[in-house]
């Protein structure tokens, strides 16, 4: 059996990153703990956390608790029986977004299959509270498939996020092994219905590579996402969070990611981020529509003016 050290040595150079723990990052992490908030950036061990928090004014909050009712074999988030919903969470998230001066916030959530509404009402309330308190911050939501509950999806979309993100994660053949509690077709239907409910809101999905898929299967998944009218695609390298999770079957090179991005753009995606360290929320602030970008611009101007007055 390979040792932990051997696994690290097998990783190619392009997956080795230099962590830049600046003052902004350290302060934000302290505030998260003080407010009993969770970010998927930390829980999922995202390699881009220092860039997003420290430089891009982007963060991904994980709501509805820190324990997921599912146990997908690629994911580092804790699984088990969740706690009761925290009804004060929407206000705390909104306050934290304000204190962090975020340009773009991604609000994701653990799957709450234990709840009748899958947590959609608290989720939508979080979006509304963030919007009320931070009118210039763009908001992306990244929900589970809500167990196929499309009333829950309608509740979410009525909160008018700037992007709806729902990840297909892998190709059709591998879906039962990678995320047994979800289905490939339910993900596509969730994305398709999201666009039908709010045609002006961009939809987005993400694929992990390195789980044993073929290039042809990746192209087919791109076609399936475009058929569901998905606008934005991110493609990143799967990295095994622990020995309990699925093993990496292949490390894709930056050149291979470049080729995948080229194919995706040729297939009609409006945006595609593809690279070894790309994750679903990577450079998400750039992917909103023009009206949302104008709000970001106004917010940036107000923030700069406030700094100059200080």
From Swiss-Prot:
Instruction: Specify which residues bind [4Fe-4S] cluster 1 according to the UniProt entry for this protein.
Output: 41, 46, 52, 281
Q: Gene Ontology terms, cellular component aspect?
A: cytoplasm
Q: Which domain of life is it from?
A: Bacteria
Q: According to its UniProt record, which cofactors does this protein need?
A: [4Fe-4S] cluster
Q: Which UniProt keywords apply?
A: 4Fe-4S, Cytoplasm, Iron, Iron-sulfur, Metal-binding, S-adenosyl-L-methionine, Transferase
- Spell out the PROSITE patterns in the cross-references: RADICAL_SAM (PS51918)
Cofactor notes = Binds 2 [4Fe-4S] clusters per subunit. One cluster is coordinated with 3 cysteines and an exchangeable S-adenosyl-L-methionine.
- State the SUPFAM superfamilies in the record: Radical SAM enzymes (SSF102114)
Q: Where is this region: Disordered?
A: 285-310
Give the InterPro entries listed for this entry.
Aldolase_TIM (IPR013785), Elp3/MiaA/NifB-like_rSAM (IPR006638), LIAS_N (IPR031691), Lipoyl_synth (IPR003698), rSAM (IPR007197)
- Know the name of this protein? Lipoyl synthase
Species of origin = Staphylococcus carnosus (strain TM300)
């Amino acid at each position: 059996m390979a040792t932990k050290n051997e696994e690290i040595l097998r990783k190619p150079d392009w997956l080795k990153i230099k962590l830049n723990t600046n003052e902004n990052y350290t302060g934000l992490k302290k505030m998260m703990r003080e407010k009993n908030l969770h970010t998927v950036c930390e829980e999922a061990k995202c390699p881009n956390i220092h860039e997003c928090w420290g430089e891009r004014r982007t963060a991904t909050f994980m709501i509805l608790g820190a324990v997921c009712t599912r146990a997908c074999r690629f994911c580092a988030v804790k699984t088990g029986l969740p706690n009761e919903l925290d009804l004060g969470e929407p206000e705390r998230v909104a306050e934290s977004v304000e204190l962090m001066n975020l340009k773009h916030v991604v609000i994701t959530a653990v799957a709450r299959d234990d709840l009748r509404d899958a947590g959609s009402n608290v989720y939508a309330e979080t979006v509304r509270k963030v919007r009320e308190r931070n009118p210039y911050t763009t908001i992306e939501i990244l929900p589970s498939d809500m167990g196929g509950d499309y009333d829950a999806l309608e509740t979410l979309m009525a909160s008018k996020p700037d992007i709806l993100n729902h990840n297909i994660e892998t190709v059709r053949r591998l879906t039962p092994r990678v995320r047994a509690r979800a289905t490939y077709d339910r993900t596509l239907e969730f994305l398709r219905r999201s666009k039908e409910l709010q045609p002006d809101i961009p939809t987005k999905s993400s694929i992990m590579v390195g789980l044993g898929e073929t290039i042809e299967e990746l192209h087919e998944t791109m076609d399936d996402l475009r058929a569901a009218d998905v606008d934005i695609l991110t493609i990143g390298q799967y990295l095994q969070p622990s020995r309990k999770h699925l093993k990496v079957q292949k490390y894709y090179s930056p050149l291979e990611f470049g080729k995948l991005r080229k194919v995706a753009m040729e297939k009609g995606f409006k945006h595609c981020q593809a690279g070894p360290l790309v994750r679903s929320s990577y450079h998400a602030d750039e992917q909103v529509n023009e009206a949302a970008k104008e709000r970001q611009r106004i917010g940036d101007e107000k923030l700069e003016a406030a700094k100059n007055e200080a």
